Every structure is written in C-alpha cells, then in structure tokens.
C-alpha cells in the first residue's frame, strides 16, 4: 500500500499492527516515512508484542517524530483498552480471535481509516462490515465509512505552559512537553530544583508485585520499565544520572509472606532480568552471608538514583524551550483572560501562560482550584548512616525499611511515615529508622550510636495511594455527574500530584501520559489505568460516599 497519499494530509499518522514480530515490518514502515518529503510530522505505531510483560509499553525512539507503543495482550483486550485515533489497521492471522474485536476497531478508527488484513474469516469480514468498514473485492483491504460521526478532535492547545514545581514531577512535565515543542516556564519557590521532596540523596527504583496484578502493580510495572528506557535516552544511570543499577533484594516479611511470593513466582513466569524469587540460600549467598531467613525477590535491573540528578538531566534535555523562574517564593495564582498568571508576594508577575501544571506536591492544597482534592502531607525522614557502621551491600536491601549501598561514604536508611509537620530532623524518627534497619539486617547492634544525620521531606499522598494525572476537576460545577468524561474541568489546569514514595518511578510515565493527553495523541497506558489516575475520580467518589444522618425537619 502507498502510505504517502494517506499521511501527507495529517499532522499525526497512527498505525495499529496486530503483529510486531521481529520488528522488521515496523522498520520498513518507518524508513518509508522518513524518506518521504511529504510525510506527516509525526508517525505513531502501535503493535502487539506477546513476548513482553503484560500491558502497554511506550518505547522511546531516537527518531524525532516517531512513537512506538508495544502492547502485550490479546487483540480484543488491547483494542478495548486503547485510547487513540487509528488511521491504518494491519491485521495478520487473527482468525482465532472471533469477532468481538471488530467493534473495538471501529471505536478507535479515525475518519476514513484504512485496513489491511490477511486471513480474516467470513464472520470477521461481516463483523467489520457491520461496524462501517467497506471492503474491496479481494476482502483484504477496507476503508472505514461509518455513518456515525467521529467525535471531534480536541482543539490544538497553545503550546505554552507554566509548571509549578521543579522537583521530579515538574521536571518530568517540562521535559515531556518541551520534547513536543512546547515553551515551558518552570516556577519554584526554592532557588534550585529538587530542594523539597525530591531532594534525598537516594531514591529506590524497583517494580511492584502482587498476586492479583492490581492497579498499583500494573502502573508501577509500566512506569518502572518506561523509566529505565527513558533514563537511557537522558544519558543513563551512573553517567548523566547519579546512581547505580546494582539490583534490589526485597526480603519476605515472614514465612507466610514468603509462601505468597512463591505462589506469585510460580504463576507469573516472570523473566529473571525483571524479577526472580530467591530462596534463603541464594539470597544469603548474594548478601555475602547476611541473614535472609525467608528469601526474597531480586530485581536485577533496579537500584538507586539521586532524584535531583534525574531532575537535572530532564531539565537540561529541555534546551532553549525552557525558562527557569526559581527562588521566587510563594506565588498567587489567578485566571485572567484565558491565561494563568502567577505573581509573587510583591505583586510582580512571575509567569503567565494558557496552561498551568501543578506539580508542587502538598503545596497544591494552597491553590483554590485544587484545594478540594483529598491530598495529605506525610513527613518522611531518611537517616544517613556512615558506611563503616553497616555491612557493605552489593544491592539495595529492603523489607519494611531499606538500606542503600554506600555513596560518598554514606548509606541511606529509612524512611518514616508520620503526620508531624516539623521539618527538622527528629531523634525519635532517627531511632525508628535505625531500629528497622537492625531488623532488616537481623543485627541488634548495627549502626549502634550512629549520629543524627539525614533529611526530612514531605510526601503528597492521595487516599487510594495512586497519583493524580490529568486535567483538574471543577468540584463546584460537577453537579450530578456520574461519568469521568462528563466531569467539568478547569480550563488549562492540570495536575501531577500524589506521588507519595514512588515519584522517582511514576514521574516519567505520568508526565508522558499528561503530555500525550493534552496533545490528543494515543495514550501510553490502558484506559482502565488512565481512569484510575484521573483527578476527577474524587468528584465521583464524593458523590457516591454515604451521607451521614440528616437533620429532622
């Protein structure tokens, strides 16, 4: 097929392929696009790839303008979870899929979408025809000609934004928007990036496992894998980013917990480079003889990174499209004439733009439009332990607590979770960290008399422990809304909030999801996960919550 006549009139040309295979067909398509002087500015390819871990995988590409999403799921499930407008479908050898996929193909088809197919059954051709596809005589080519009007594409936003917050959430937002050609102003009250919750010496990056593969597990898996790929594009761990992919060993809490983990290992067929269950002898051998009484999970590709260095790498990648307004103190936010305007305590305008992204953690509660969001500030204290006071570890070790290998003669241990608003180091929190460290190492004398040293940060946490990613809801205008898509939103106001202790992992993919959504691109996550992260979920939950006793008349 000659794609050139199809993509020359589109700003983005999206292809869905039911078989990635060895990638050769995708490379041919990309080569054709690259060499066409009349090509669309952007080529987005979505393909099924069964050998990957379950879910959606956004694969960063060196080629500007090319996006590749690989999905590990059955065809019907993948299409049902896809948020996209597809211009071309390539369906290969799907006769075993039945006919349910046809309605999902029609749902994501763009106006005048085309279809190439091999091996369709008569029932599948009939199902696609019933959904609005008109086939050629050969039964292998079709065009979407549904009489149902396609939902109008959202208007192209003006590509200027303010990002409030220069921590891990804000830096990721700036980098993902600048990568799309946006002009971004990052505003922060501190004089340097990553001076608040993102300022720890070390953050742990690792996946999450669960028996039921629940929402936090699926989100964290997708975000972890995206982060590893994206960080390589930024220069890599140990190079542009300070840290080490030394691996993480997560010990089982007790014998019962170990049995649950063995069941996960037996049922998931996880690749060893992603996660491997180690029994006690293997775990203790890895730790050089330290106790690991109930075994644990080894995440070989995981490790630690200094969040501030990740922020710096992302902000540096923005180039000349980024303006930094740091050290401005607290700001006042107003909407005026289609613009968001930030002014400092002296009434001087710091920045203005049609789009504002709140990435300032618990500080979002001070913004009137975000104040109804049920966000909580939780204090976390990390202890800095002299390296000669604890065993030298080849990996990050964690259970209820964590301990990193040494960096600069210091190991990080922690961290506490409490509601104390005091930003000063607390001897009680330090003692709590050391007590849990001794339990982790099975050594009652580890780090004995370690001096009070460390850092305090404040996490922003949502009631469901999931992040808030997307356009912020207007609680006052919500009325009797029952569906997420119908919730009224504040114009040009977005949130990247509620990262709790997983900002290092969640930030990159969350920012990519936000930027893709603003631009009207195919989304990098399943729609069920997108909905689970939508800030407007709390509007619906507030409506559905049981009311207390009503006063009698």
List each language-model region with its residue ranges:
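Helix-loop-beta segment of a Rossmann-like dinucleotide-binding subdomain
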Residues: 211-212, 240-250, 274, 280-318, ...
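Helical element adjacent to the flavin cofactor pocket in flavoenzyme catalytic cores
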Residues: 297-346, 350-355, 359-360, 364
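Active-site substrate-recognition segment that forms the wall
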Residues: 140, 148-180, 189-190, 194-209, ...
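S-adenosyl-L-methionine
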Residues: 51-81
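A short glycine-rich, Lys/Arg-flanked "PGG" loop and its adjoining helix->strand segment in the class I
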Residues: 99-111
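SAM cofactor-binding core of SAM-dependent methyltransferases
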Residues: 2-58
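C-terminal catalytic lobe of FAD-dependent flavoproteins
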Residues: 449-553
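Dinucleotide-binding Rossmann-like beta1-alpha1 core, especially the glycine-rich loop
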Residues: 202-286
